[in-house]
């Protein structure tokens, strides 16, 4: 005769393994999606850095030429 507790534990262990495999697949897909998002955000970050550098250069130029005016 088989031990009913052993059968129950085996069934539970099988369910746990199945759920962990599904979780692993979901996390793998999430990581891939995050990589794609990060790659697409690189262009936005670059444009932001360029704009900040441009604004800093314009401010420096206006201060040096004494044409910087107070905000309205």
Swiss-Prot record:
Belongs to the DASH complex DAD4 family. Component of the DASH complex that connects microtubules with kinetochores and couples microtubule depolymerisation to chromosome movement; it is involved in retrieving kinetochores to the spindle poles before their re-orientation on the spindle in early mitosis and allows microtubule depolymerization to pull chromosomes apart and resist detachment during anaphase. GO terms for biological process: attachment of spindle microtubules to kinetochore; cell division; mitotic sister chromatid biorientation; protein transport along microtubule to mitotic spindle pole body; spindle attachment to meiosis I kinetochore. Component of the DASH complex consisting of ask1, dad1, dad2, dad3, dad4, dam1, duo1, dad5, spc19 and spc34, with a stoichiometry of one copy of each subunit per complex. Multiple DASH complexes oligomerize to form a ring that encircles spindle microtubules and organizes the rod-like NDC80 complexes of the outer kinetochore. DASH complex oligomerization strengthens microtubule attachments. On cytoplasmic microtubules, DASH complexes appear to form patches instead of rings. Residues 15-35 form a coiled coil. Keywords: Cell cycle, Cell division, Centromere, Chromosome, Chromosome partition, Coiled coil, Cytoplasm, Cytoskeleton, Kinetochore, Microtubule, Mitosis, Nucleus. This is DASH complex subunit dad4. InterPro entries: DASH_Dad4. It is found in: Nucleus; Cytoplasm, Cytoskeleton, Spindle; Chromosome, Centromere, Kinetochore; Cytoplasm, Cytoskeleton. GO terms for cellular component: cytoplasm; DASH complex; microtubule; mitotic spindle. It comes from Schizosaccharomyces pombe (strain 972 / ATCC 24843) (Fission yeast).
């Amino acid at each position: 005769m088989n031990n009913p507790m052993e059968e129950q534990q085996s069934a539970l262990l099988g369910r746990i393994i199945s759920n962990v495999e599904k979780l692993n697949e979901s996390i793998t897909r999430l990581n891939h999606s995050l990589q794609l998002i990060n790659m697409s955000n690189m262009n936005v970050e670059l444009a932001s850095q360029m704009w900040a550098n441009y604004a800093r250069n314009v401010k420096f130029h206006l201060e040096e030429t004494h044409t910087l005016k107070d905000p309205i």
